[in-house]
């Protein structure tokens, strides 16, 4: 698994790109599921109007972002979907990387069951941040968990491929920050 030191890099854009191709692994209720990280978005606390911690705003919900890098920041979006972020950087520098999509690697049958995705297109199984959490069974219960534990971690192994960079999705409220190309996608089929 990746060591804690990997997550302490202050450049969240670098880490958002660097996480691509690594395998996100969960072992929850005795069931192992995993997938290659193929889409990420960087959120840079102090100066990013799309970030929950913009201008060093601190709330009960976003307080995990102020922790030392290497923990999970999971929150509810629209009160419905859990979204999984990797907290990065040193203590009190609120950066995080949203894991937007994975490519199933292990336990795909379990993911299909968790998402009730039988007889549906497999390429849509984990192609969104809420879908990732549902497929891997990540909930608010896993918020602040270390990413160096047997039940939640990211592998050292890494797949390669073509990386593209685009603006982030669904942040029209973020004024000039909405067009920053801080979304990274990995095509490992090339």
Curated annotation (Swiss-Prot):
It is an enzyme of class 3 (hydrolase). InterPro entries: Formyl_transferase-like_C_sf, MPG, MPG_sf. GO terms for biological process: base-excision repair. GO terms for molecular function: alkylbase DNA N-glycosylase activity; DNA binding. Its EC number is 3.2.2.-. Keywords: DNA damage, DNA repair, Hydrolase. Belongs to the DNA glycosylase MPG family. HAMAP family: 3MGH. This is Putative 3-methyladenine DNA glycosylase. The lineage of its organism: Bacteria, Pseudomonadati, Chlamydiota, Chlamydiia, Chlamydiales.
